[in-house]
Amino acid sequence: MSVCTGSALLAKAGLLDGLAATSNKMFFELARSQGDKVDWQESARWVDAGQYVTSSGVSAGTDMALAVIERVFDAELAEQVVNYTEYQWHRQADADPFAQLLNQGVTPS
């Protein structure tokens, strides 16, 4: 699992080649510049590509972690974590309210 701009490091290492991934919208072009063989998803809170799961921002990382718990274990356990942490889970990976921030931050020089 990778949170925020960690996907840029995975991309630079070639670990995301041929896979879908996402990154923080404010640093998206920076991440994209690290992996031209990555299928970058601009409007995703997180992307589950099987072996690698990437999230856009830090709070999206919590949503991603809950989705992984649900996939690996079950929905009941994920809901328990939600309740214990008093967190409002955004379950839809493709419903990113921050997509409009795409490319408004740091770009590679």
Predicted regions and their residues:
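Active-site-adjacent pocket-lining segments in enzyme domains
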Residues: 1-109
